[in-house]
Amino acid sequence: MKYWPIFVQIGLLTSCNGQVKTNNPGDQNKAVSTTEGIVYFSNDFGQSWSNQSNGIPGDVFLTDISASGDLLGISTKQHGIYLYDFVSGEWTPIKRNKPISPDIDALLISENKIYAGTQGEGVFVSEDRGESWESINAGLENLTIRRLTVLDNRLYAGTNGGLFSFADEQNRWVRAYGNDNLQVNGIALLDNEIYIGTNKGAYKATLNQHNWRLILPDRSLHNISTADGIVYAMVYSELFASKDKGENWYGDQSGMPVGMYSFQVVEAGDIVLDGQWDGVYRKDNILNWVKLNTGLPIKIPVTEMRVWKNILVVASSQWCK
């Protein structure tokens, strides 16, 4: 069996009374190296973990993870973007030159470009690892960015006002689907079909066409993903799954806490992993999930997971022991 290294990343570290935890309580901005950690790596499908949090301030609120080529990055709400240095084993902040905001909700690294989606200021791109930034908002009708991804060599942005795709030939965004009231929280691809998870349900269409249709009504989704040929819809009380591309759905919560929702579902090699409110779960069979928290702090809401170079990166925010 092939093994895939795994990173787990934990965002804003809070105690149960809401106070930020650092090694020195008097220095909220000091880079942390605590038993709780902010980032964890695993080389054995989550069976064991090592804390790899050097360089990240203790008061960060992590928002996203992205990786491509030799770059692995995290975005935050206060401190901008950090890149991981595999030589030093530390996270280093990239420059926050104007006009980019330090308040970043969506991060995408693709073909040596870094895209940052902000809350209210649209999308920025850097082609020199953050030395300089350019705003790319032409045609973008909503500047609050929820998600950034590339599908079939085209850049997509999920916003608080619909799904947009970037037309390189025109150097501007065009609305792919939705209206000013459609919040797009997740974007996924399966067999040449694009899926979006929104505040008004799940929709799908053939890639690069406009034959959108509602496939999961009466549900508010905070994310959607595909893994092992299955579509996973993450609503605010349960995980739903579809084996027939959204035609039929079933609850897929067995083995995970009742009433607690999943943040992410990803495929790593021949296994499927779920980021839940209390840690990481592995799909044991078609009907059950098994917890994989050996070596991790207790009660970690794992909000982000990404696979990169045989590595899985997982993130969280606002947790307590």
Language-model region placement:
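Bacterial N-terminal signal peptides
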Residues: 5-14
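An edge-strand/N-cap motif at the start of beta-rich repeat modules
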Residues: 17-58, 65-67, 72, 86, ...
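Short coil-to-beta transitions that initiate beta-strands within beta-rich domains
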Residues: 22-26, 53-68, 95-110, 137-151, ...
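Loop/turn residues immediately N-terminal
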Residues: 37-39, 78-81, 120-123, 161-164, ...
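Conserved Ser/Thr-centered positions that define the repeating blades of beta-propeller domains
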Residues: 42-43, 83-84, 126-127, 165-167, ...
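Beta-strand initiation motifs
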Residues: 47-50, 88-92, 131-134, 170-174, ...
